[in-house]
Amino acid sequence: MAAITASMVAELRAKTDAPMMECKKALTEADGDLAKAEELLRVKLGTKAGKAAARITAEGVVASFIEGTTGALIEVNSETDFVSKNDSFIALAKAAAELVAKHNPADVEALGALPYSQESFGPTLEEVRKGLIGKIGENMSFRRFKRFSGSKLASYLHGTRIGVVVEFDGDETAAKDVAMHIAAMKPVALTSADVPAELIEKERTVAAAKAAESGKPADIAAKMVEGSVQKYLKEVSLFDQVFVKAADGKQTVGQMLKAANTTVKGFTLYVVGEGIEKKVDDFAAEVAAQVAAAKAAA
């Protein structure tokens, strides 16, 4: 059997970015044949990716790309916050955002089929994703994306966990300020008329329950409910919210935009992991189960 040297392991690691021990194992199995070891790693890492695919991805990053009046916003998920800070993972998200903007894929599957390189050759985005899963040992997925075109665009990223793209006409500085405001205050619609009916009904139900508990007469309780709903609508409607940078603490976003002669036509807000049920590990229960299983086997 051929001797496996440190330089051979280093060379294979440089080619594959696989963990050091995995490289050594592959070289040993391939009897020192670098090309064969590389192929073995590719198969092994692919298998590793397959095993990871079923695990929940509730962490990750939001990335954006804007070029003129074309842009994109994308959320790419990972299992842990640690991986979401990995440079290769962040690069994957940024590349995906650019591909969405430039190629307008119909869905995640179509996005994955696009070449990772802008030169249109080499591995696809999906192949790069699977390769990263194999190297890192953690599942990752393209959760959602949106493409924008035909309008002036402004974006704001709060770290890598919150991303906003605003479609507007007028002053770019004002639009960027609004994007930052949206990231901070998280409105659900431009105006109260745009708030989804199901959200209003949910708020009305909660308000009605509170009013019933108050023991007030029916007419007063009804006014309490309506007051709560109207307050909620102002709190979640962008134009009615108090602008986060308002000098007087009173100016609304709508008033600020009017003063800046700027119109916001729409916005998209992504928050990493929003709506995803995260897995909670109960280590005490897990240990207890293992002890019980060991006793049963004894």
Swiss-Prot record:
Residues 80-83 are annotated as: Involved in Mg(2+) ion dislocation from EF-Tu. Keywords: Cytoplasm, Elongation factor, Protein biosynthesis. The keyword Cytoplasm applies. The keyword Protein biosynthesis applies. InterPro entries: EF-Ts_dimer_sf, Transl_elong_EFTs/EF1B, Transl_elong_EFTs/EF1B_dimer, Transl_elong_Ts_CS, UBA-like_sf. Gene3D superfamilies: 1.10.286.20, DNA helicase RuvA subunit, C-terminal domain, Elongation factor Ts, dimerisation domain. GO terms for molecular function: translation elongation factor activity. CDD domains: UBA_EF-Ts. It is found in: Cytoplasm. It comes from the Bacteria. Pfam families: EF_TS. Belongs to the EF-Ts family. This is Elongation factor Ts. It comes from Paracidovorax citrulli (strain AAC00-1). The gene is tsf.
